[in-house]
Swiss-Prot record:
This is UPF0210 protein Blon_2054/BLIJ_2131. CDD domains: RNR_PFL_like_DUF711 (cd08025). The lineage of its organism: Bacteria, Bacillati, Actinomycetota, Actinomycetes, Bifidobacteriales. Pfam families: DUF711 (PF05167). Belongs to the UPF0210 family. HAMAP family: UPF0210. It comes from Bifidobacterium longum subsp. infantis (strain ATCC 15697 / DSM 20088 / JCM 1222 / NCTC 11817 / S12).
Amino acid sequence: MLNIMEVHETNQMIEQEKLDVRTITMGISLLDCASDDVDKTCDNIYRKITTYAKDLVSTGKAIERDYGIPIVNKRITVTPISLVGASSCKTSEDFVKIAHALDKAAKEVGVDLIGGYSALVSKSMTPAEELLIRSLPQALSETDIVCSSVNVGSTKTGIDMNAVELLGHIIKDVAERTADNDSYGCVKFVAFCNVPDDNPFMAGGFHGVTEGDAVINVGVSGPGVVSRALDAAKGKDFEFLCETIKRTAFKITRVGQLVAQEASRRLGIPFGIIDLSLAPTPAVGDSVGEVLEKIGLEQVGAPGTTAALAMLNDQVKKGGIMASSYVGGLSGAFIPVSEDKNMIDAASSGCLTLEKLEAMTCVCSVGLDMIAIPGDTSASTISGLIADEAAIGMVNQKTTAVRVIPVEGKGVGEMANFGGLMGYAPIIPVNQTSCEAFVTRGGRIPAPIHSFKN
């Protein structure tokens, strides 16, 4: 039974502590849209998305109005397009046509982003998957809200180094084609290892082939709520600290569960999962970095940062998992540099380095995220970053990812501005010592010995 104090507390979390539902994401299967003609495939895709998602935005706004809970984004994920377009796309330009169809359909229904222009190549690439990857520079530079991801490895299969090597060149090409906008195209692309099928967040969201015809997934956000709660834990021991984070994560996730079930009921589409992630914004007081600093660090990046993040991530999961019948996606604490005020400050001061961020990815929910690097960084160096992150994910049986932006025409210390939720970031140095002979060997890195569980 709710009491009036709990109602007041929830209101305070929304009004003063920036609690919001970051996204309601509708996943839609496009497997039945495939044909042997690319124009017909595009028509099928457009028709299915605009039919299934026609009420998504209005329903999100109605739930916002009825419950007083801010819902920041409404999004769509679709089946990886490398699968949908495999029979009809004979060139990279054919895949770009599908990207335009996705962009047009998403704009028609009014969503903020659409994800799933993706390929799953953790062992090797089919001809269609390679065509899609090679189409990325044109697709991401010519569309506005289409997001893309490529899964290059997994604990079970190892790492596809041919794909990793290719992606270094692709990311450079995307950066050059969108140079007039601080290489914004790279914001819409992420390389994964152990990618989840049900991620509601972008740019890595897609509708997995193990999913049904359509599903509603919800991502919550509440670093500001956790930060405010930690004011009461100042000077207390770790037991008190952990309990505070856990209880707060439970309350945050309960809000997401309510929104997910209500959206599912109103849209007549099954509820999938709640993603428990703490997703920051560039606004003051809505920062994962601030939470880490309240745990006891002078600034993010100081010794102890990785341990503090590991503890935060674990307590968020432990608290959140009790508040929802189904959890999934990435679920943990995000560390996107450009989207987090305190991390922006730490990177600007030099306290938070790329190497420290890599260490933090061993224990956070994803990986190297929204990091601006010099525009003259080589393709092989970017491939090396992807390989390092994929190795961390593969060996530790966790999801890792790389979303770096080599900002064309800018160097260390300059600022890149991506706007809105994507924020802004100082360009940080990257070790330029060559790894080209390593990433160009070809083939794949085998799966680790502990992957053999059968």
